[in-house]
Amino acid sequence: MENFAEKKISKPLTFGEGIQYVLDRISIKPEDRQTFKEDAQQIQNEFVRAISKQDPYFASAFRGLALTGSSLDNVRINLPDEFDMLTKIKMPCKLEPVPIRSHPGYVFLRASGDNIPIHLVDRWEDEYCIDRLKVQAWFRDNITAVIPELSNIRCNDGRSYELVNKTIGDVAHTIQAKCLSDPDRSISFDFVPAFEFSASEWPRIFPQHRNEDRSWYAVPSEFKYPNVGDDPLSFLVCAPYWERMVLTKKQHLKDGYRLMKAMRDANDMPKIYSYTIKSVFLNASNVNKLINWNQSPGRILIRAIDLLAMFLRKGKLPSYLVPDRNMLDRLSVDMRQDYRRKLCHIFRRLIRCRDRDCMTSEDLQFIFGMRY
């Protein structure tokens, strides 16, 4: 296919050509994909090795890293320089997920049997449950201890990296690897503590999904609802490999997903997270004929923007895994209205481009923040 991003353009593009131009601009170069992947693997290995050496309990509990997020779904744009990693932990006792009925998608992790890790649990009625604040403190203390020694991780082609702790949220531990030989190159990692469960352990009160016996996870997360008190025992369920099954073999869907991310970045909508966009596509895939995935990426983008605007108007975007959980709970009414207004303007501009089969440089600037 002709790469419009690499040619000189002397006349207005058709709608399809304009969309392809954007896809070419935001696509990841094969050489970048390879070198970032290799460097990330080496950095991850050194990071885990250092913590395992620092903390024998972590070494005995660690069960590997599982890629999640946009890199797993192959929808990252521009550079493959961010990696979301589930850090799998196995406790030496039995853990049972107990749904929190008042908070859809959340569970307690009840600990029982021998060898309950007293330093990571708290009392819940007459039983023990994993305390996410203690788990996060455990991770944080280990990271703080090893970061100073990870100042020169050697990778391929003479590149070396220094690690810096950038954690600010309540779920992931964010580590930035700064390339010492190239100040413009860095790699960001979000390490999320994750307790792994088999598909058969998925709580029965939650909707059932196609899973091919793949695992799901419980990750530390405070309640995402406004004006609700925190509970240190709360964990959120996630199943990235189940969700990946829904998106697989739908290349036009993934192209529409990438276009949505580029549109969001260009129009100052930072609270429309990548997972928010993913939830729009998961919901559309879950309802027969809501979107025709055989359409061109540009037409899928138009439909997806229309759907997101509808969800913002209603104030609710259902989670794919647990539909009673609202993915928009943390957006204020004013922010929802602001984002919806922007989306409606973009939607109308795209419709005009589609109907006249022409996408000018000004159109691309308005929608995607780029020109040809």
From Swiss-Prot:
GO terms for biological process: defense response to virus; immune response involved in response to exogenous dsRNA; innate immune response. The enzyme activity is specifically activated by double-stranded RNA (dsRNA). It holds the Pfam family Mab-21. ATP binds at residues 70, 82-84, 240-243, 261, 274-278. Mg(2+) binds at residues 82, 84, 190. Belongs to the mab-21 family. This is Cyclic GMP-AMP synthase-like receptor. It comes from Drosophila eugracilis (Fruit fly).
